UniProtKB/Swiss-Prot annotation:
Protein name, per record: Bifunctional protein FolD 2
Family: Belongs to the tetrahydrofolate dehydrogenase/cyclohydrolase family.
Subunit structure of this chain's protein: Homodimer.
Organism the protein comes from: Pseudomonas putida (strain GB-1)
HAMAP family from the UniProt entry: THF_DHG_CYH (MF_01576)
PANTHER family in the cross-refs: C-1-TETRAHYDROFOLATE SYNTHASE, CYTOPLASMIC, C-1-TETRAHYDROFOLATE SYNTHASE, CYTOPLASMIC-RELATED
Catalytic reaction annotation: (6R)-5,10-methylene-5,6,7,8-tetrahydrofolate + NADP(+) = (6R)-5,10-methenyltetrahydrofolate + NADPH; (6R)-5,10-methenyltetrahydrofolate + H2O = (6R)-10-formyltetrahydrofolate + H(+)
Gene: folD2
Pathway: One-carbon metabolism; tetrahydrofolate interconversion
Length: 303
């Protein structure tokens, strides 16, 4: 890596390490007060990639002092059985965060399962209560990847107010919540998608460009304004010169001379996603404690 690349690189690994250190310190303070946050990860089936993701999440939780559990269910698990497990976890006071690893087997209704999770324990931020709360600017659990991207942007850019942000992709997991978080930060936001016309012209307006479409090297130099900051959420496996490579949605080599900062793939956004899962577990605990306090206060109030 040359000096120019180093200067422009937005290092997700280093930032994630700082986030995890912050979480570890908060967890230590909580444990001194007799409280240990708890995270449960549920995996249905034996998808190899999902197994790796789940293991990484559990390991990170253990590293920062969060009590973690795995529930590994066979691929033929019924929806009713999965919903029963979620109901039990919802009622368990020692469980602060619940994550159901996606994708689920085809016979299980993903929407139904995600809606069954208590919104205050929904550390993925996918429940409609949290999605709506994000749109309204309320203090709710938000999806981990967009939240991690916002930390990278604030560290790289400082003040975001007034900047023009272009989000390429409109998925429920990244694109839409990313746009909502950027709006909350007082950015001017454009969302570009598969039906948008003249992708390069729209992208060239961006002070901040977030690419999240899952198309290798879709964003070339012709899509970038000089001095833009680029967050590449895409992670695509391609075969090139007889070897497998992981590349982003942005053509890194073509983009580098033009941008002020860019995340690499791998090592950019990925580590931030898991780091913000840990932060969300602490936020979930805090929201649950607030809700319990409000409930106690309401019970003590005169009619």
């Amino acid at each position: 890596m040359n000096a120019l690349t180093s200067l422009k690189l937005i290092d997700g690994k280093a930032t994630a390490a700082r986030v995890l250190a912050e979480v570890r310190e908060q967890v230590q303070e909580l444990r001194q007060g007799g409280v240990q946050p708890g995270l449960v990860v549920v995996l249905v089936g034996a998808d190899a990639a999902s197994q790796v993701y789940v293991r990484n999440k559990v390991l990170r939780a253990e590293e920062v002092g969060i009590r973690s559990q795995e529930h590994r269910l066979p691929a033929d698990t019924t929806q009713a059985h999965l919903l029963t497990l979620i109901d039990r976890l919802n009622r368990d006071p020692e469980v602060n965060g619940i994550l159901v690893q996606l994708p689920l087997p085809a016979h299980i209704d993903e929407h139904c399962v995600l809606q069954a999770i208590n919104p205050l324990k929904d550390v993925d931020g996918f429940h409609s209560e949290n999605v709506g709360g994000l749109a309204q600017g309320r203090d709710v659990l938000t999806p981990c990847t967009p939240s991690g991207c916002m930390r990278l942007l604030r560290d790289a850019c400082g003040e975001l107010r007034g900047k023009h942000a272009v989000v390429v992709g409109r998925s429920n997991i990244v694109g839409k919540p990313m746009a909502a978080l950027l709006l909350q930060a007082d950015c001017t936001v454009t969302v570009v998608h598969s039906r948008s016309r003249d992708l390069p012209a729209l992208c060239r307006q961006a002070d901040i460009l977030v690419a999240a479409v899952g198309k290798p090297r879709l964003i070339g130099a012709d899509c970038l304004k000089p001095g833009a900051v680029v967050i590449d959420v895409g992670i695509n496996r391609i075969n090139e010169d007889g070897q497998n490579h992981l590349v982003g949605d942005v053509d890194f080599a073509a983009a580098l001379p033009q941008v002020a900062g860019i995340t690499p793939v791998p090592g950019g956004v990925g580590p931030m996603t898991i780091a913000y899962l840990m932060k969300n577990t602490l936020l979930a605990l805090d929201l649950q404690q607030q809700a319990a306090h409000q409930e106690r206060t309401a019970c003590l109030s005169p009619c």
